[in-house]
Amino acid sequence: MGRIAGVTAGQTRDRLLRAAADAFAERGYDGTRVADIAAAAGVSNGAIYAHFDSKGDLLTGALRTHGRRLLADLFAADPDRSITDLLLTIGRWLPRRRDASGYLIVEALVAARRDEDVAGPMRDYIGERAGWLAGLMTVAQADGEVDPALSANALAHFCLLLAMGSALVTPDLHAVGDDEWTALLNRVIAAVAPTRHHAEAGVMPQTEMT
């Protein structure tokens, strides 16, 4: 059983990524066999290796395609909305994270510690996400929403830690009230806002000064 009749190579790849995302989220990286993914996608094992170099490559491919990207989706839907408002919206959602994509990132992070086939692609994936977030922070700094004296890279790293942590510390392990969490987020946003001194001095974002 190779490629399904009437299905393009791109469609076959999409089917494999969907099947892989579901399998890894449900059974974990170690508990999922390539044969399981192939069977779920309705193709042969050979069809997988026509598109992906390894099981680890398939995991990171599934994460890129089906991993949660709510911030990017919100930004694309409303690019004129303030970035700090977008961050607050995502931040309020984090403690309630219970979707399959959350399990997918956990599996990828755990597998990356044990399997170099996963570690390399995951470094690339995290680097891409960090770069995108840092770019967003630079825009927020230029728009006067975030203190330009702060490192955009450090701000991006902070956001990544919150997002990854929310996938690990689920509400069934530790819950927090919506009101108290929102109050904390508002305090954090206020803390990274431009100081009066920097606003008056017109300090440039760090990423633009280097």
Regions found by a protein language model. Give the residues of each.
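Short, solvent-exposed amphipathic helices
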Residues: A100, P121-E128, W132-G135
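Hydrophobic alpha-helical connector segments
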Residues: G61, A72-G102, A152-C159, T182
